[in-house]
Every structure is written in structure tokens, then in C-alpha cells.
């Protein structure tokens, strides 16, 4: 990823509230989006901040990592600019944001089924596409988690 000292890109004007995202904290511009590696990300604080600024959750991309963890890339659209917060699960789990952002419900259920991520704080993780009797983790190299 190429780094840039200043947000924004593409001539988009951000208001002062976006300065809270602090480009000096490691934001990098790549593939048409701004990315921030945030291993210690508080997803609930991030979600509250983004929603307060009228951002829209686009999706959460996931990828298996070493030691049974899963990388989670939270993609947000903020005034036409994509901001991505990249983080990693902790002991196979991560706090849910579905109660704050209902659009995350489907995404979290899908990530749970494909990568066996346990989203803590959810009232219910009912099956989305997983057939009865199958264990979550269908996309993990080691297969489903037992």
C-alpha cells in the first residue's frame, strides 16, 4: 500500500469531524480506499463514531490468518470515500456490532459460518446458510472447528 500524508483523496472535501480519524495514525491509500491497520480496534467505538458521522457499513471482508485467527476488514462509505479498518480476531472471537448497526447482522452470521468467528455480545447467531449438523468454519483450511 502506498502511504499518503493527507486525507482525503480524489478531491473530496472532508469536514472537521474527519480530522478525528487522524491520518498521521497510519492511514494508507490503496486501491481507491483508505486503510488503517488497527489490531487493537474497538469495533463498537469505531461503529458508533462512523454512524455518528452518517457513514454506511459496506461489508466486512474476512480472511483466515495464522494461529486460528481471522482478519476482519470493516469497509465503510463516508461521504463517497471508502474507509477500511483492518483488524484480527482474538482467540477466535470479536465483539459484535450488530446491535449498533443492523446491517452487520447478516455479515457477522456469514463470517461465523465460513470462518467460525464467535461474535460476542450477540443475542442469537441463527444459521444463515449452514445446513443442520454442519459446524461453522467451512472456509478454514483446517475445515470446520470442532
Where are these regions (language model features)?
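Terminal low-complexity/charged segments
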Residues: 1-146
Amino acid at each position: 500500500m502506498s502511504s499518503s500524508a493527507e486525507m482525503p483523496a480524489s478531491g473530496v472535501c472532508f469536514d472537521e469531524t474527519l480530522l478525528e480519524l487522524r491520518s498521521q495514525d497510519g492511514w494508507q491509500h490503496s486501491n481507491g480506499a483508505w486503510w488503517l491497520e488497527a489490531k487493537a480496534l474497538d469495533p463498537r467505538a469505531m461503529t458508533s463514531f462512523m454512524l455518528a458521522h452518517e457513514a454506511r457499513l459496506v461489508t466486512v471482508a474476512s480472511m483466515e490468518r495464522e494461529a486460528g485467527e481471522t482478519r476482519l476488514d470493516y469497509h465503510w462509505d463516508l461521504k463517497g470515500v471508502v474507509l477500511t479498518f483492518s483488524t484480527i480476531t482474538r482467540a477466535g472471537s470479536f465483539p459484535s456490532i450488530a446491535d449498533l448497526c443492523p446491517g452487520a447482522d447478516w455479515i457477522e452470521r456469514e463470517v461465523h459460518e465460513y470462518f467460525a468467528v464467535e461474535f460476542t455480545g450477540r443475542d442469537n447467531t441463527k444459521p444463515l446458510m449452514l445446513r443442520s449438523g454442519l459446524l461453522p468454519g467451512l472456509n478454514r483450511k483446517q475445515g470446520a472447528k470442532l
